[in-house]
Each structure stands twice: as C-alpha cells, then as structure tokens.
Amino acid sequence: MNAKVKITNRAGASFPVRRMNFNFENVPEYWMNGSAGLTHFMTALSALFPAGEQFFIDSVRAVRYHPAIKENEVLQKEISAFIGQEAMHTQEHVGFNASAQKYGHDVARLEQQTDIVIQGFRKTAAMLFKPVGVTQEMIDLMGTTALEHFTATIASQLLINRHIQELMTDETMSTMWYWHAIEENEHKAVAYDVFEGVFGTGVKAYLARCGSLIAAMATLFVVQSYFVLRLLKQDNQLNLKALKDIYVYGYSPSKGIITGMGREMLAYFKPGFHPNHLDTVSLLANWKAKLGL
C-alpha cells in the first residue's frame, strides 16, 4: 500500500479513525485504465469531497449536544469517530486534487464551486422551508443524511463490482478509493441516527428526508456531470471515446456503478428504513483484511 497508516480509536466507537498519508506524486495523469473519461469522472467526484465532507462534519457538530442526544454516550462516540474519518477523507482528497492540478486540470476551481453550490442549496432550502418550521439544522442534516446514503451506496458498489475494480489500474488511487469506500460504509448510520435522534421518526421527518434525497441527487447529478464535461473540455478530451467509457463505467445496465445503485437508493424511501438494514459487514471485513486495515 502506498500510504502510511495509523489506526486509532480514542473515542471507543464501533469503527476506528485511520490516519492515512497517501503519496500521489507518481500517480499518472490518466490513472484509471489510461482513460481520460474514467479518470475525469472520478476526479469530478473527488472535487466534491473537500467542501462536501466539511458540510457533513458541520451539520453533525451543530446538533451533537442537542438535549435529545447529548447524553447518548454510544452515539457521541460514533459522532467523534465519524468526524475523524470525514476529516481524513478531506485531507486525502485535497492531496489527490492538488496532484491532478499539476497536469493542468483546474480541480481547485471545482472545489470552490462545490462550496458555492452547497451554500446556495442551504440558503434556498432555508428560504423555502423555514416559514413552515424547518430549522437550518434540520435542513443541513436532511442534506447530510441523503448524501451520506449516496456515498455509502456508491462506495459499496465500488467494493462489489469486479468490472469497476479491473479499471482501477493505479495502486495508489485504487487503495485510496477502497479505503474511502470502506469507511463510508463503516459510518453510514451516524448522521442518520443523529437526524432521527434530534428530529424523530414521524411523518414530518420522513417526508423531509425523502424530499431531501430527491433534491440532493438531482443537484449532485447536474453538478458532477458539469464538472466531468468541464474537465474533459479543458483537457481537449471531450470526444466520443471518453463519453463511451463514462457511459459503460457509470450507466450501462450490466456494469454501471450508478445503475447498480438502484435498489439500495430506493430503500431510503421505505418507512422505517435504517442504513444498517443494507448489510455490508462481511463485505467490509473481506476488504479490510485485503488492505490490512
């Protein structure tokens, strides 16, 4: 593994914080099977993470000492470990994004635009829903729980889909994405448990979380697609081959990472849903053993 790993569990949570230190210096420009399309698809995702992960952390921190959950010692430990993992994800994606920048890909600009989109989404949602009693804290947690469900689901696909794994031809990058995927599934229930602990499980909370998933997925699709096209155009790689590679990787019925997410994404709309109903325990155990995590 091209990373120095330090594993700690000071919080005593059900999962540890792994302090990674990947070296991206020798990552090739088109690190994913030599394909500009595939590489820029994943780089566009990576550009979302620094601002996105910080939003998740801020959303959970804002309510962690709410009277309804502040005495819940188990959940408080999970929150601390969640924050630690998300902070490490931010650090490593910032490192990779900077390495992509050296090839002339303006990922820094995409990181800035991600934050602009998040803040605009927050303000728009507040304008629409505060008059009916939805607080900013609830809006932020709605978005966080929805996006955490997406990240955990796409992460599990990355760990399941052999076709996708075969395309991850650079060891440093594949290890980074597999590590990130493992941790997204380890902490997939934390923001959800915070949301339910603070805002309950009634009809209002159910409608809020379902509506937020629809809005978040629509926004995410538009933003990530724009980022991909921008990266391809800047790189003079906006061509049929790149778009075909992206289609097969992301959206083909039999192999696509996005199309493979359908059942798990729809499960979010079930009354009584909980992220842990989507069992990935054995999957994670196998991958942690494989990577020495």
Predicted segment positions?
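Non-heme di-metal
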Residues: 2-293
